A protein has these predicted regions:
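Helix-turn-helix
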Residues: 1-24
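Hydrophobic alpha-helical segments that form the core
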Residues: 75-76, 115-134, 150-153
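Amphipathic alpha-helical packing segments from all-alpha helical-bundle domains
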Residues: 34, 49, 68-71, 83-109, ...
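Short, charged helix-capping/linker segments at alpha-helix termini
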Residues: 45, 111-118
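Hydrophobic alpha-helical connector segments
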Residues: 24-27, 37-70, 120-124
Length: 159
């Protein structure tokens, strides 16, 4: 109403236009994925087992999710806007930071120091993003399965 745009117009619902719509899509995707990560990690008390389980579950369901997904690809969005739209880049960064924090929190609960857990959370998110992109590109869940297996080995070597 405030924008005085016609009721059917995008500006009626999103006065700031496409940027507001994109930002809200980023935030909603972030919330849904964060909730999924939290539920997945809650499946195991041990962080290493939980993270492995989470990646394997993502692999098992990834192509079904891609075909039926209402969420946007945060990787695609962030690589598109990183140099052209600071508002959307920051929205993507905020979401990635939240996801990384979920992993870090799980690691802290398993006895890791806060700073090490923060760094590992970032590494885990990076590893998952890369494996997910490779799996889509190769039309195969093998990269996701390898990531899950190798993360398990890395954590086993830590203990």
């Amino acid at each position: 109403k405030e924008s005085s745009a016609p009721r059917g117009s995008i500006y009626y619902y999103f006065p700031d236009g496409k940027q507001q719509l994109a930002k809200e899509a980023i935030q909603k995707t972030g919330e849904r994925v964060k909730s999924y990560i939290e539920k997945s990690l809650a499946s195991h008390e041990d962080a290493a087992a939980a993270i492995q389980y989470h990646i394997k579950m993502m692999a098992d369901r990834m192509f079904e999710q891609v075909e039926n997904e209402a969420d946007i690809s945060l990787a695609a969005m962030s690589s598109e806007v990183w140099s052209s739209n600071e508002t959307l880049r920051m929205a993507c960064e905020d979401v990635y930071n939240e996801w990384e924090q979920v992993y870090a929190d799980k690691l802290v609960c398993s006895g890791y120091e806060q700073e090490e857990a923060r760094q590992l959370g970032s590494a885990i998110q990076s590893w998952i993003e890369g494996a997910y992109t490779l799996s889509l590109t190769k039309n195969s869940t093998v990269p996701m399965q390898i990531a899950a297996d190798q993360i398990g080995k890395l954590f086993a070597n830590k203990n």
